[in-house]
Amino acid sequence: MKRDIIACGQKVDIGTRVVLWSEQEGFECPNPRGRNSCSQHDPSLNDAPSEKFKNYKIKNPKTAYQELKENVYQLVLHYDVCYTSSHCHQLMRESPFKGSHFYLDLDGTLFQTCDLYWKTNTAPSDDKKGNERAVHVEISNLSWEALAKESEYYPSKQDKYKKTDKGWKLVLPQEYKTKILKRPFNAIPARTFGERGYFSKKVNGKTVRMWDFTEEQYKSLEKLCIGLNKLLPGIKLKVPFDKKTGRHPLDRLNNYSRFHGVLGHCHVQNGSTGLECKYDPGSAFNWGRLHRAFKKTKP
């Protein structure tokens, strides 16, 4: 069972299952790009239309790894607004430019879609340079699409989470149940809020209502962050935190382009420069949990 994440051929065992793009169950990034800050590839791959995956070749992996460590210092978290990672990949393939280095499925399975040397166009940030400095992970969660009254992409008469004797659980369509590697699997939120189950907070000016991610996702995410810090030390074990209020901010940061660590798409893009305003990983994400996990990690 593979547990490695890879950058320029360098590997780090993160202690949990990682399905690589080269495996039968894996997903190849449909739209990788070259990073402008790195030189060990054909520069025509930087912003050209997507080519066949095999055409993305690293010339000198050793030099490439040094360049990557010098230029990449953020892990950006996203909710994928999908049922599962296979659903997310399906939508990525339909786009001419979208991609993500990692998918994190409901059951905690991580998928790496390409070598981290390559850029994926997932979060341009308000300065339009965000993808150059970042690694991205799409975490399976429907966000507000799970609420029937707010659902736009997947219209339904009932909420997509159901309250049972054992608590809330996501009602997965059959076509997605069979695509999860750990079967059978019940997607249960790690935390719930009161009787309604979902969390509701303002993120970049919008009230975001959503159920939490799963316990399995949080456990794998913690390991991914720690592993990335070993592989790319510029990605510090640090999350946005306001010392004055003692809280984790949910709006775009003033210093978003200089922040070294783990942050959300909401922290780098509020639409102030003409791009779409972003809210992920949303109101339910437990930033405090990551913060505490990082504090316990030995340097």
Functional labels for PLM-detected ranges:
Residues 79, 114, 138-143, 225-233, ...:
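Sec/Tat-exported extracytoplasmic proteins
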Residues 132-138, 143, 197-204:
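Glycine-rich, often proline-containing surface loops adjacent to acidic residues and nearby aromatics
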Residues 83, 143, 270:
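Feature marks short, surface-exposed loop/turn motifs that line or immediately flank catalytic pockets
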Residues 101, 135-139, 221, 263-265:
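Active-site scaffold segments
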Residues 122, 138-139, 143-150:
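Extracellular-facing segments of soluble proteins and assemblies that are Gly/Ser/Thr-biased and enriched
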Residues 1-133, 152:
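N-terminal catalytic cores of peptidoglycan-degrading enzymes
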Residues 71, 135, 144-145, 155:
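Carbohydrate-interacting regions of secretory-pathway proteins
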Residues 1-42, 68, 149-299:
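Basic/polar, cationic surfaces and motifs that engage anionic cell-wall
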